[in-house]
Amino acid sequence: TLLDLIECLGTTAADFFKETEEEQVVFSEQGYFEKIDEAGNSIQWIVPTAQRYRMEPLLVVVQPHQSLEEDKPHDGEEFGYVMSGRLNVILGEQIYHVKAGESFYYPAKKIHRIENPGQRPAKFIWVSTPPMF
């Protein structure tokens, strides 16, 4: 019978026929959360529920001659795409220069920091895994 098949699948009739909740796929600005630090740098969580997932995408604006807080080594990886301006990505003692239209990717095994050496705000998409913020 159908109930025997459901039992063989290791579930109950209620769970078998329960409609699954649809995951949100599209996120709009109304759901974004923003944090602005003392220097005026902005971090926007563009997928507000990202803590539940494996990646955490952020929209970040770093003000001229400012930097984000230094991050300690951790398990995970970080990726960024610079939309406007330019950044220095500092991994340990090494400095990498990244300009608009370029991306960066690194394992987060060293102390790392992102700074804006330019005269204009730098805007970039930043994705970390696992979620950090």
Question: Residue locations for each model-derived region?
Answer:
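A short, N-terminal "cap"/entry segment at the start of jelly-roll beta-barrel domains
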Residues: 1-54
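Hydrophobic packing within well-folded, soluble alpha/beta domains
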Residues: 2-6, 16, 82, 114, ...
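Ligand-binding loop in jelly-roll beta-barrel domains
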Residues: 41, 99-100, 108-133
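Short acidic-glycine-tyrosine-enriched beta hairpin
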Residues: 46, 92-108
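Short, conserved beta-strand element in jelly-roll/cupin
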Residues: 61-62, 72-89
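Short histidine-centered beta-strand/loop micro-motifs
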Residues: 68-74, 115-117
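Structural motif
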Residues: 79, 86-88, 95, 111, ...
